[in-house]
């Protein structure tokens, strides 16, 4: 993702984007099928336990996979002498769909021009809303409730979901957003696709999976710093910038929303066009490469301001 240098207009929660992001390929694999119900429950409980300890696995999906293995390895390495990850004792809770939830669900226009004319980029289905709210894959929510992948869900319907702190798009409150840094810093590995928050002594505070750039549009290595944090950003699509690296007047400005190409939160760096941001499709986050930015799930990216702020150092390796 290429982004213009920060403007004063950022106070209006507007970020001018100059190219689009693709997925992030970092050798990530996962099982294509669910195992037994017992195995799914064990995996969900393990993934949940890691997430609650600030070792994100991305989507909670109940399957074996690289992201869970990496988070487990990092957890064990950072807790020498401690027991291995203990699966969460209460991995599930329930959610009852409310009439007001449907305000955030609707069809998206199929073209850039059409989406640019929309006021808000909603979820495309209630299953998508519920899954993102509980940090889960849509396939897992469907599996847990005996549903097809394109179910018709209605207000009043109760679903079994992972027992996490819910990501509520209707009450998005990014705690600490825009405050000054507190001494913590960020370390990103482009090769492994990981982002770690460390304290002044180098102690690990939080761990996340991320996707980074390709050989053609590499995420820039070096020492940078955070210069802004923008909840619910807009997105500027410019084909000339994407293909030729030249800003043009032929562009589309996408409105905010969970399906905005940069998700629900932008953390800008003092490297023109580069930032850490959310993503509308968490299930495809690690299947390709970005155009230089660092992408996270929407529910992960909004937690960053709890640990780092404006002025915090970001080391990209």
What are these regions (language model features)?
Residues 252-317:
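C-terminal soluble interaction/assembly domains
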Residues 22-25:
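Bacterial signal peptide processing site
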Residues 34-69, 97-135:
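Primarily a LysM-type cell-wall glycan-binding module
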Residues 171-279:
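Gly/Pro-biased beta-strand-loop elements
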Residues 18-20:
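C-terminal motif of bacterial Sec signal peptides marking the signal peptidase cleavage site
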Residues 1-10:
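Bacterial N-terminal signal peptides that target proteins for export
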Residues 66-104, 140-177:
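Extracellular LysM carbohydrate-binding repeats and other cell-envelope/extracellular binding modules
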Residues 51-55, 73-81, 132-136, 142-149, ...:
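Sec-exported extracytoplasmic/periplasmic mature domains
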């Amino acid at each position: 993702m290429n982004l213009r240098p920060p403007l004063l207009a950022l106070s209006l929660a507007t970020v001018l984007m100059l190219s689009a992001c693709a997925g992030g390929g970092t050798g990530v694999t996962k099982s294509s099928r669910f195992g037994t119900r017992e195995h799914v429950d064990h995996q969900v409980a393990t993934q949940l336990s890691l997430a609650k300890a600030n070792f994100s696995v991305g989507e909670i999906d109940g399957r074996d996979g690289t992201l869970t293995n990496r988070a487990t390895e990092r957890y064990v390495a950072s807790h020498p002498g401690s027991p291995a990850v203990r699966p969460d004792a209460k991995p599930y809770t329930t959610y009852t769909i409310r009439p007001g939830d449907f305000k955030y669900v609707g069809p998206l226009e199929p073209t850039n021009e059409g989406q640019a004319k929309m006021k808000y980029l909603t979820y495309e289905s209630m299953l998508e809303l519920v899954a993102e709210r509980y940090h889960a894959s849509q396939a897992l929510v469907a599996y847990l409730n005996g549903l097809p992948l394109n179910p018709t869900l209605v207000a009043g319907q109760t679903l079994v979901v992972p027992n996490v702190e819910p990501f509520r798009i209707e009450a998005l409150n990014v705690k600490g957003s825009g405050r000054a840094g507190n001494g913590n810093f960020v370390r990103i590995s482009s090769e492994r696709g990981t982002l770690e928050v460390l304290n002044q002594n180098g102690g690990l505070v939080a761990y996340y999976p991320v996707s980074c750039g390709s050989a053609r549009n590499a995420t820039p290595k070096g020492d940078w710093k955070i210069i802004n944090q923008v909840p619910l950003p807009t997105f500027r699509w410019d084909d000339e910038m994407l293909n030729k690296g030249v800003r043009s007047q032929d562009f589309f400005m996408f409105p905010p929303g969970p399906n905005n190409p940069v998700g629900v939160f932008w953390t800008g760096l003092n490297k023109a066009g580069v930032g850490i941001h959310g993503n509308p499709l968490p299930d495809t986050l690690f299947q390709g490469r970005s155009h230089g930015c660092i992408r996270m799930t929407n529910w992960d990216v909004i937690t960053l301001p709890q640990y780092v702020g404006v002025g915090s150092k970001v080391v990209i390796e």
